[in-house]
A protein has these predicted regions:
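Positively charged, low-complexity terminal tracts
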Residues: 1-74
């Protein structure tokens, strides 16, 4: 871990997206095993979360872009 990191459990960076009744949180975090993104969907207090290791960021983003491009052509 690095000296200038926020306290444990605090995200290194965070984004919040609100769409209708849903709120999405994207938190970049770090622990002893490395950096990861915690993606949380909150719908009326019910939360679902996935953890994405930083080694998968680029592949995830590329797959996401392909889906967005495909959907735009429908």
């Amino acid at each position: 871990m690095h000296e200038n990191l926020p306290p444990i459990n605090e995200p290194l960076a965070s984004e919040k997206i609100t769409m209708d009744r849903k709120v999405f949180f994207l938190d970049l975090k770090e622990n002893a095993r490395g950096r990861f993104m915690k993606i949380t969907e909150d719908v009326g207090g019910r939360r679902d979360t996935i953890m994405l290791p930083n080694a998968a960021f680029r592949e995830f983003l590329e797959a996401f872009a392909r889906i967005v491009e495909f959907e735009s052509k429908l």
